[in-house]
Curated annotation (Swiss-Prot):
Entry's Gene Ontology molecular function annotations: translation elongation factor activity
Gene symbol of the encoding locus: tsf
Function: Associates with the EF-Tu.GDP complex and induces the exchange of GDP to GTP. It remains bound to the aminoacyl-tRNA.EF-Tu.GTP complex up to the GTP hydrolysis stage on the ribosome.
Keyword Iron belongs to the record: no
Protein name per its UniProtKB record: Elongation factor Ts
Amino acid sequence: MANFTAADVKELRDRLGAGMMDSKNALVEADGDIEKAIEILRLKGQKGNAKRGDRSTAEGLVAASTQDGAATLIELACETDFVAKNDKFIALSESVLAAVVAAGASTVEEALQAPAGEQTVDQLISDQAAILGEKIALRRVARLAGEHQEVYLHRTSKDLPPQVGVVVDYSGTDAETARSIAQHIAFANPEYLAREDVPADKVEAERAIVTEISRNEGKPEAALPKIIEGRLTGFFKQVALLEQDYAKDNKQSVKKVVEAAGLTVTGFARFKVGA
């Protein structure tokens, strides 16, 4: 005769989100000891997670929060869009984000060790991965803590949670323009804030490429410097936020838009699921 009750099964399911039969079997194996049953389920979950270790996690969601003068952005990855839109996965992302924010974590390593109730974020993710049957990973974390922050989350499909997330750090008072800049970043995907932030070796590599292209096109040698600089300007427009044409008015650069609004963008982070 089983030495546990339906209430024990319910408690185990509520605490771990495990299935009915998994909970019953764990309680049988644990002789009715709930804490031991939890350890049994977690151990089985860890073994399952190990088997899933090499699987690709190209789906998931981004989530963000602004609190106490800082903005935090995370990407939580899974294997399929079916799990990405699952209520348990979305609830997990909310719990992970709350724990990361509370800990002030700014890296994945710090975030995984952040307390999440009676366990760490790493353990919380591991438990839910076992329940959902997919590899789940906290892929990226960013934390910005300047004067002001603005957040923008974008859905690429109405059936899925946000797939693109942006946080912007800025000084100034025009929050509406700051949010518009966050939307621009989501659309234009700059890699750097200003042209001065682009690594010198990357600039020189691009210079070598456009020089070779220009010469192969038979451009006059005397005209090459001007042509090369023009093409480098196009390169900076691709990779540097302030050099880009503003998405809502391509007759203006982002730099001119923020200057006109009295803003100074001091940093940003952009995550796209799977990218």
